[in-house]
Amino acid sequence: MAAWSPSVGIGSCCLNNGITRTWKFPSARLFTGRKNKIKLGSETLMFTRKRFMGDLVTSALQSYQFSKICASKTSIELREALSSRRAEADDLKKVTSYSFRTKAGALVKVKVEKKREKYSILVYVSSLELSGDDKSRLVMVWGVYRSDSSCFLPLDFENSSQDSQTHTTETTFVKSSLSELMLGLEFDGKESPFYLSFHLKLVSGRDPDGQEMLTHRDTDFCIPVGFTAGHPLPLGLSSGPDDDSWNFSFFSRSSTNVVLCLYDDSTTDKPALELDLDPYVNRTGDVWHASVDNTWDFVRYGYRCKETAHSKEDVDVEGEPIVLDPYATVVGKSVSQKYLGSLSKSPSFDWGEDVSPNIPLEKLLVYRLNVKGFTQHRSSKLPSNVAGTFSGVAEKVSHLKTLGTNAVLLEPIFSFSEQKGPYFPFHFFSPMDIYGPSNSLESAVNSMKVMVKKLHSEGIEVLLEVVFTHTADSGALRGIDDSSYYYKGRANDLDSKSYLNCNYPVVQQLVLESLRYWVTEFHVDGFCFINASSLLRGVHGEQLSRPPLVEAIAFDPLLAETKLIADCWDPLEMMPKEVRFPHWKRWAELNTRYCRNVRNFLRGRGVLSDLATRICGSGDVFTDGRGPAFSFNYISRNSGLSLVDIVSFSGPELASELSWNCGEEGATNKSAVLQRRLKQIRNFLFIQYISLGVPVLNMGDECGISTRGSPLLESRKPFDWNLLASAFGTQITQFISFMTSVRARRSDVFQRRDFLKPENIVWYANDQTTPKWEDPASKFLALEIKSESEEEETASLAEPNEPKSNDLFIGFNASDHPESVVLPSLPDGSKWRRLVDTALPFPGFFSVEGETVVAEEPLQQLVVYEMKPYSCTLFETINTTA
C-alpha cells in the first residue's frame, strides 16, 4: 500500500490526517513478473500472475491474476480473476461485504477480508454494459482518508503517479469469467483503520474523459478498512459478540459529518486517530455507527459533529468541539478536564445476595442528604479519601438507623458541572467522580455499589434525585444535535436556556435508558424527578395533560418496582412550580403545599382548613386514585432556609420562605426567644411525623445546622458531626427517633395506604366547638382519631399481628397564649396518657411510656389540659383494667 503520513507534504486541508503519531509509509517499488501490462495513472505497470493469498479454503475467491506494487511494509495489488468459481467464505468473521447501486442501476459489491495481517479489497461491478469499441473500459478513481472525507491522504510510491492535488489514483477494472468487472487492492493491516473512497468512471473512445458514476445517493462509494460499519443498536459503546471489538453507536440527526475520535493516551487532549464516519456505510437513519477491533490500544473516545448549518468552508471539522457520548457508562477526564468515554467495561461487582428492602410507600421514612456534605467535615473522623464520598455515607449508616430512617434520598449524583452544582448535570449514565475515594469514575462506581449494598443490608432503600429537564451549559448534549435534544427554535421562553425537550422521542429514549441503567447496574430503589413540571412540556413547549415520557416511565416494566416521585422545584428559577401532575397511580409527589401550609400555621398566618388537610394526607391532591402515602411531606429542603433558620430569620428578603424569627432576627442570647424557637422546631417535627404521608427530613436539621439566613443552595454547610453531641442535637435526634417509633407502632393511623374515615375523626376548637376553618384569627385545632374496629382494620389492610389500636388526641396551639383543652370523655377502664407536649423541658417533653393525665377534681369526669403557647400535644388512650 502506498503511504501517507504527517511527515509527507499533504496540503493545507489536512492538518493531522486524524493521527498524532507518525505512521510512515515507505516508498513503493515496481514488482515485475510475467509481462502483461495495465495502466495505473500515467505509468505502465508490470504485473505477474500468481495465486492470491495462497490456498483460499476460507476465502471468497480461489485464484486471481493480479499486479503488485510492493514495498517493505505495504503494497497495492491489482488482481484479475482466472477462475469462474467463487465460494462463500467459511470464516465470515474475517469477511465484510457491502453492496451499492449506481444511479444507472449497476450493482457494485465490495468485499473486505483480513488475512495474514493484510486487508484485501475486491470490487465487483455487474449489470453494466460497456460500449463495443476497444477503448471502452471502467476505471475506479480512489483515495484514502481518515479524519476528513473531503481530503484524501497522499500516497507515496515508486514508479507510479498520483494526482498531486486530489491525491486520487485511477485503476482499471478487468472482466472476470462471470461477465462481471472486478479489481482488487491489498493494504498492510498495520496502516488501518482508514476509509477507501472511490467513484467509477466509464471511459470510451467517444468520451476519453469518462462519464462519472456515483451511488444512487449521488455520493462516492466509501468502504471502511480495519473496522466495520458496526450496528446502530444499542446506542453508546458495546462490545462485539466475542468481545473482540467495540461497537460505537451515536445519535445525531442534524449532523452532516460525525467524526469518531480515538485516544491512545489518557494524558493528552489530542486524539490519536480520527475517523470521519461515512453517511452511507456508517449511518442508519439518524444513528451513526462503527465497529473497531479492540486489539488497538485506544483508551478514550469522543465525537466531533458538524451540523447542516455549517458548510465545509464555514468551519473545519477539527474546529468542532469533541463531545462526550451521551450513553457512555464509563467516562474519564483528559488533561484539560474534558470528559470522554472510556474504552473499558464497568468492573464486575459481587452483589452477593443483595435484595431491595422493597418498603411500601406508606412505611417510608426518608432522609435527604448530599453525598459530599454528609461526611466532608473533619468532624466525621473519616479518612480523607473516604470523607465526602459514597463510602462515607456507608460508614455513617448507624446515624441513619438512629433516626429511624429506612430510605435515603441522595441529591443529584450524576456527573455535573462543578461550577453550577449537582442540579446541572452533563451526563446521565455515570456518578460524579468526586464521590469516589480516589476521585475517579471507577472508584465512584464501585463505592456507590458498596454503599447501596450496605444500606440494603440495613433495610434502607436508596432513592436518587434526578434532573432530566435541563443540562449544564457546556460539556453536556450541546453540539450533538441541539434541535433534537433542546428546544432550539421551538419555544421562546425555553430557547435561551438549557432545557431538554423531554417529550421528544430521542430524549425520551435517553431518559428511559438512564433510569433502567441505574436500576439494573446500581440497584437503585427509586427516583425523585427535580423540576418535574417541565416534564409536562410538549415538543414545542406547550403544556400536555398526558406527557409521553411521564406515562412511559409509569409503565416501563424494568421500573415497575421503583418509587417515582415528582418534585416541581425548579433549580433554574430557584422556586417550586405547582401543577396538576398526571400519575397513573404510580407517581408520588413532593408536597409543596404541605410545606407552605404548615409553615403558615405555625407562624400564625394560616387557616385551620389548610392544616387539617395536610395532616390528613392532602386529600385535595391525592384522592384521585392514589392515597396519602403518595404525599412526600417536607418542612425544609436543601434550597431555602434550614429548619433552625426558619424560626430565626424572617427579613423582607425572605418573604417567600414563610418563616418567623420568633421575636428577634438572627442570633440572640434572649432566653425567651431561644425557648420559643426550640418549641417551634419541635412543633414542625411533630406535625411532620404525625401527618399521613411520607416524612422527608433534610440533612442537618436534626442538629441545627444554619446558613445564617441564606436561602441559597450554595450556602449550605457540611454536616458537623460534633453538633449531634450538643444539647440541641441530642434532644432533637432523640425526639425524631421517638416519633418514628410512634409512627411504626401506630401504623394503623400514621402509615396508611388509604385516607382516614371521616366517621373516625372528630375536630375541635379550643372550647370543644366546631373549628372556624377559614378564620385567620383561629390558631388552635385539635382532633380525636378513633380506633377502627377489627373489620375496619382488615379492610384498610393493616399489618397483621399489630397491637390493638387505641384512640388518639392531638392538639395544635399556634397562638401566643395558653389554651385549656378538654379531652374527650372515655368509658370506664380507659384513661388518657400524654406522649408528647412540645412545651415541656427536655427530658420529659416526649415519653415512650407516657404520663397518665387525670381530672383535677376527683369527682370531675372531664380532663382539662392546659396547652402552653406555641405547642403541640399527643395523647393516647390506655386500658387501666388489664
From Swiss-Prot:
Span of the transit peptide along the chain: 1-70
One Pfam family here: ISOA1-3_C
Keywords: Carbohydrate metabolism, Chloroplast, Plastid, Starch biosynthesis, Transit peptide
Disruption of the gene: reported phenotype: Strong reduction of the starch level in leaves, but 50-fold increase of water-soluble polysaccharides. No alteration of the amylase-to-amylopectin ratio.
Signal peptide from the UniProt entry: none
Keyword DNA-binding set for record: no
GO cellular component: chloroplast; isoamylase complex
Family, per entry: Belongs to the glycosyl hydrolase 13 family.
Stated role: Involved in the trimming of pre-amylopectin chains. Accelerates the crystallization of nascent amylopectin molecules during starch synthesis. ISA1 and ISA2 work exclusively together as a multimeric holoenzyme. ISA1-ISA2 removes preferentially branches that are very close to other branches.
Protein name: Isoamylase 2, chloroplastic
Organism: Arabidopsis thaliana
Organism classification: Eukaryota, Viridiplantae, Streptophyta, Embryophyta, Tracheophyta
